[in-house]
């Protein structure tokens, strides 16, 4: 696996995270650190797309923005840009802390498995938090599972990387990218129309739905001239 900057700067990384421990010893808060991919979970989501993403692409966008809202709540201020691209893909970029990335006891980079494992806070709960569309929040893995492809770009103080997924499964390692001195996450995805239906998202409706305390959301529609 290519080493992202967290392992290039091992001293800094270990000050910021419990380095030197096997990842199955790290405390789970939102996801299970011991599992990088839960293929059965992803397959379940793909079998029942209307259960886990009612409303299709719009619900997937809200699932992503909800994580930016989580970040904003911890700082009382955050910014997010949702871009509807001409190829019907969608990107969601925020200025939060970025996805937690650590080095294990072997010096290998490990990122919190937000894309390919269930969110322990929401997925199996009957009374999960409701998103602004009125449907339960299930987690980022639903977005990955129901997308033809998804690219997760992550920037933290200890380095930056990108990783590509197809049908929820990672198809690349963590690929280091230039550190711009900023932090935040970009999730760029193309929903699978065979599972979610055709993309039917308007910028106006999305602007009305992406309302969270402490988070400023800008919607850019590149599909129109």
State each model region's role:
Residues 146-150, 182-185, 212-215:
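Short glycine-/polar-rich loops that comprise or flank the Walker A/P-loop
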Residues 83-85, 153-155, 219-222:
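Short hydrophobic alpha-helical segments used for membrane anchoring or interfacial signaling
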Residues 1-77, 104, 200-201, 225:
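Bergerat-fold GHKL ATPase/HATPase_c domain
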Residues 186-225:
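Glycine/threonine-rich ATP-lid/beta-loop region of ATP-binding domains
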Residues 63-97, 101:
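ATP-lid-like helix-loop hinge signature
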Residues 5, 44-51, 96-173:
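Flexible ATP-lid and adjacent glycine-rich G1/G2 motifs of the Bergerat
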Residues 26-34, 111, 173-177:
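A broad "non-catalytic interaction surface" signal
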């Amino acid at each position: 696996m290519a080493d992202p900057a967290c392992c290039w700067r091992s001293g800094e990384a270990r000050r910021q995270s419990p380095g030197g421990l096997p990842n199955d010893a790290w405390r789970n808060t939102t996801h299970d650190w011991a599992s990088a991919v839960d293929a059965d979970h992803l397959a379940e989501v793909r079998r029942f797309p209307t259960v886990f993403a009612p409303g299709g692409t719009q619900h997937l966008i809200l699932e992503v923005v909800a994580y930016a809202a989580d970040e904003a709540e911890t700082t009382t201020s955050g910014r997010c840009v949702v871009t509807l691209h001409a190829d019907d893909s969608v990107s969601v970029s925020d200025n939060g802390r970025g996805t937690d990335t650590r080095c294990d006891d072997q010096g290998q980079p490990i990122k919190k498995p937000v894309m390919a494992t269930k969110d322990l806070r929401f997925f199996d709960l009957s009374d999960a938090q409701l998103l602004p569309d009125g449907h339960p929040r299930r987690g980022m893995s639903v977005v990955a599972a129901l997308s033809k492809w998804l690219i997760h770009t992550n920037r933290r103080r200890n380095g930056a990387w990108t990783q590509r997924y197809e049908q929820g499964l990672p198809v690349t390692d963590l690929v280091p990218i230039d550190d711009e001195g900023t932090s935040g996450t970009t999730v760029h995805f193309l929903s699978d129309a065979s599972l979610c239906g055709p993309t039917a998202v308007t910028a106006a409706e999305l602007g009305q739905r992406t309302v969270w305390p402490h988070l400023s959301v800008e919607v850019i529609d590149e599909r129109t001239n």
